[in-house]
Amino acid sequence: MSAPAAPQYKVDVQKAVGFQPAPQKVVYTSRDLMLYALSIGVKQDELKFLYENDAQFAAFPTYPLVLGLKKDTHGVSVYGGGGKEDVPGIPAFDPNKLVHGDQSIEIFRPLPLGGEFELHTTVSGVYDKGKGMVIERTTKMVDPKEPSKPYSSMKGSAFVRGYGGWGGPKGPKQDSYDPPKDKAPDAEYEDQTNDDLAILYRLSG
């Protein structure tokens, strides 16, 4: 069944917000951690993220952000772009209209160097932006044996172009972090990324 045309689109916000799908199993190893570090540009002078025998070997703190796409596979994940949300109150939409929006992460404790974990997700907001719809989710990475002690909490949003105008809430005003006026930077840092980072990043999920 194809997605309805945008003018007929209607979201039931009360059904959607607060929905929690089944926990998602995720698996990773120390090799996955090192591949991720390489894919975000970590250099060889930061061996604590790149070499498993380093005395301070650790996971790069933002690694949980890719686990929702990696899931529990050790192969290459194929992302179909969505379109069928399986969220009560959100009808199907054209997946080609979906783009990534905001992303943030809060770290509560150091990540283990590998193992099996779960992602617990809640639909925390659905907003009508006029020209499109924003779907916001909050996801916690937990050990299934200790679900009350998350390692991290991630908030992400997706913007679906052309699916607005259904009379829903506009959503809260976004925080603005404009640089101070009439003040020079305290420090400046310049770095050159490699051309192949996107190819490496894809392998992390």
Task: Show the residue positions of the predicted features.
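HotDog/MaoC-like acyl-thioester-processing domains
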Residues: 2-22, 98-189
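Hydrophobic, proline/glycine-rich low-complexity stretches
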Residues: 2-116
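Residue-identity detector for threonine
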Residues: 29, 62, 73, 121-122, ...
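A mid-sequence, solvent-exposed acidic-amphipathic segment
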Residues: 181-205
